[in-house]
Structure formats: structure tokens, C-alpha cells
Regions:
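A short beta-strand-turn-helix
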Residues: 45-71
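Extracytoplasmic/secreted proteins, especially bacterial periplasmic and envelope-associated proteins
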Residues: 45, 49, 72-75, 86, ...
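C-type cytochrome heme c attachment motif
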Residues: 79-86, 126
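N-terminal targeting signals for export/organelle localization
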Residues: 1-51, 159
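Non-catalytic, surface beta->alpha helical segment in thiol-disulfide oxidoreductase systems
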Residues: 123, 128-159
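Short pre-active-site segment immediately N-terminal to redox-active cysteine/selenocysteine motifs
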Residues: 69-72, 76-80, 123
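Structural signal for short hydrophobic segments within the conserved structured cores
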Residues: 43, 103-105, 136-139
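Thiol-based oxidoreductase modules, predominantly thioredoxin-like and allied folds used
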Residues: 76, 87-95, 99-114, 121
């Protein structure tokens, strides 16, 4: 009788330990998936980040000089803007599709009005397609994903 009791207790403890290990592994995998998703998501920029990663518009207001190490797309948007909300999931998909090849930046014109004013942003969404050299190509309004892909391929990746 005692032998059966110890066997049942042992099995119960093994099941509990296995459950804890399985739950722990699931949490680690979920964290890894979240990290991967964040790694390839559009990057929201503040004024200081824009100046250090994209262009220092405070020091040089006449000439565009891109500071990044990869071409980029800059989305000037507002949280209340309908067309901007339509473009957002497209940019998330493109961030994953072109991960490692380009950056996709987002600038909230309400939170960062100085950046918007420096580049004359009056219509949103306004998108800058910034190659490594030369001036950015500018597009205003929402576009289908295929148009974004064409601009990225031709202007940024030059394929």
C-alpha cells in the first residue's frame, strides 16, 4: 500500500515539474517572438533621434544630408489621420519584408511639430524615400503596398 502511494506521489510530482518546464519554455518562446516582431517594426523617432539617425535639420537647413547606414522610408503621420491608419499596417509588413535592407521610420507630426515644419509637411501622410545619396523622393497620401514596394526597389535599393 505504501509502495503504491509513493509511486503515485512520484508520478504526480513528475507531472507537476514537467508542466512547469513546459510553461517556462512557452514563455521564453513568446518573448523571443515578441522580440523578433519588435526588431522588424517601424521605428518611431523623436526630434533628438531624427537629428542623430536621419538628418540634422537644426545645423543644416538648406542641404539634405542623410546620416543613416541604410536607406530609409520616413512616414510623417498623425494618430487621428484616417489615411495614416491605412498606411500603418503596410509599413509594418514592409519593415518585416525589407528587414536588414532599409529602415522604416515614423514621425508623429503632432508630437514633433518642429521636424514637420523644417520639411514643410502640410499634408499627411507624407512619405520620404531616402536613398543613401541624393535627395529623398516625396510621396503624399496613402498608397497601395505594391506602390511602396516599387518605390523601395527603384529608389532605395536601386534594382
Amino acid at each position: 500500500m505504501k509502495k503504491k502511494f509513493y509511486i503515485y506521489v512520484g508520478l504526480l510530482l513528475a507531472i507537476i515539474a514537467g508542466s512547469f518546464l513546459w510553461i517556462s519554455r512557452q514563455k521564453e518562446e513568446a518573448k523571443a517572438r515578441v522580440y523578433e516582431a519588435k526588431k522588424s517594426a517601424p521605428i518611431h523617432l523623436t526630434k533628438a533621434e531624427f537629428i542623430s539617425k536621419v538628418a540634422n535639420f537644426t545645423a543644416n537647413q538648406t542641404d539634405w544630408k542623410y546620416l543613416g547606414d541604410k536607406p530609409c522610408v520616413i512616414d510623417f503621420y498623425a494618430t487621428w489621420c484616417g489615411p495614416c491608419k491605412m498606411v500603418a499596417p503596410i509599413l509594418e509588413d514592409l519593415a518585416s519584408q525589407y528587414d536588414g535592407q532599409i529602415y522604416i521610420y515614423k514621425v508623429d507630426v503632432d508630437a514633433e511639430p518642429e521636424i514637420a515644419a523644417a520639411y514643410g509637411i502640410q499634408s499627411i501622410p507624407t512619405l520620404f524615400f531616402c536613398p543613401m545619396n541624393g535627395t529623398p523622393q516625396i510621396s503624399q497620401g496613402a498608397m497601395p503596398k505594391e506602390s511602396f514596394q516599387k518605390m523601395i526597389t527603384e529608389v532605395l535599393l536601386k534594382k
